[in-house]
Curated annotation (Swiss-Prot):
Cofactor: Mg(2+)
Residues annotated as domain Obg: 1-159
Molecular function in Gene Ontology: GTP binding; GTPase activity; magnesium ion binding
Protein name from the UniProt record: GTPase Obg
Free-text function comment from the UniProt entry: An essential GTPase which binds GTP, GDP and possibly (p)ppGpp with moderate affinity, with high nucleotide exchange rates and a fairly low GTP hydrolysis rate. Plays a role in control of the cell cycle, stress response, ribosome biogenesis and in those bacteria that undergo differentiation, in morphogenesis control.
Species the sequence originates in: Cereibacter sphaeroides (strain KD131 / KCTC 12085)
Family classification: Belongs to the TRAFAC class OBG-HflX-like GTPase superfamily. OBG GTPase family.
Annotated binding of Mg(2+), by residue: S173, T193
Annotated binding of GTP, by residue: 166-173, 191-195, 212-215, 279-282, 308-310
Amino acid sequence: MKFLDLCKVYIRSGGGGGGCVSFRREKFIEFGGPDGGDGGNGGSVWAEAVDGLNTLIDFRYQQHFFAKSGQPGMGSQRTGRSGDDIVLKVPVGTEIIDEDEETVIADLTEVGQRVLLAQGGNGGWGNLRFKSSTNRAPARANPGQPGIDRTIWLRLKLIADAGLLGLPNAGKSTFLSATSNARPKIADYPFTTLVPNLGVVGVDGKEFVIADIPGLIEGASEGRGLGDQFLAHVERCSVLLHLVDGTSSTIVKDYRTIIGELEAYGGDLALKPRITAMNKIDAMDSKQISDRRRALEKATGGKVFTISGVAGTGLMDVLRALWAEIDGARGDKVEEHAPWQP
């Protein structure tokens, strides 16, 4: 399935049906009085987060969603049929943004979460509604309210607990394949990964979701390489795992390149908890591992894990460190949403 994480959609709610002007006509009843029914309500447009989707590709082939209008009222106090609602089914993690591309209308982060995008117009009143003690035979009815035209953007931000960062060929896809159920494409050339991949990782009986995004290069924030468009998919992560290629002769520069791109991207991404791991130690001797780890720890100001995605060395230590951060973040969220108790 092709991956699409941003699309423009045009929606319109249905207009309300017009009210009816009608008078009761029966044998031997000369003045039957008004009996015009109301018009039906127009259909509304909703968005709903559903399980089983991880792309917006369906909206590439259909961008226009117009709800049906309500039917006009009829005589004998019959109300017109209301228009059916339209529901846009989107993946969990979809942001709905106004046409200005800045105002967030809704952020659908849970299965079943719904938001009303365009309310259908109310049906007009029939002349029966206007009957009064002074006007026994009103000959007026209301037209239905018009529908609402709206242009919106859908932006998908995948929901994962941990995000994988690094330069192209840092071994992110190999790490994901070695630690999870994901099977991303792996090859010895840059930008093998072109779209984000998700994998479920198990460690000590616990599970969490990790996201692998295409590699960043220097200047990604300015559009070089694949740009920084995929960084949106790790914005929701509790922790970031920064993989650095240990066989690189510019290991410190490589590390700082990614940090610089995180800072250029903006938001809170550069402030997220981050774990650094030096990868590909299976292709290094002990002195190289020691020297480059020391240089990297000096640059990061913290601990650096040494791992090999190919050989499986050191992976469990990294996964446990990731889980510790994720577990702490989940606990904080539970406390935030806990009801107040005296």
